[in-house]
Amino acid sequence: MILVPLSEAKTYLRIDSSDEDTLIDVLLTSAKQICADVARLDSDKWSVISGETENTDTYTDEELERIQDVMKVAILYTLGYLYEHREEADHHDLVMTLRNLLFAIREGVF
């Protein structure tokens, strides 16, 4: 399972053609990384959330589903922001919004 496939990203952005697939794919990869960084997820937890590896003892099924739902919204929001503000993106505002979106799943750092 891919958390946000290219086809879903294009639907979210309301893009029908394949002319910008490469750009959207790059922005989608960046959006995923930005969201993982803001949520303070290490690579092991991110691979479980993104569906790259099987969930073993990291999360319960309910926790994983809730986290995936939140991450999906955050990734799509970030993708839309990066796509619409390619030239003048304010990354500080983006990160502050993502912190609020991802607050419930953010990992604590001590």
Residue ranges: model-predicted function:
Residues 1-110:
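Divalent metal-cofactor coordination and adjacent catalytic microenvironments
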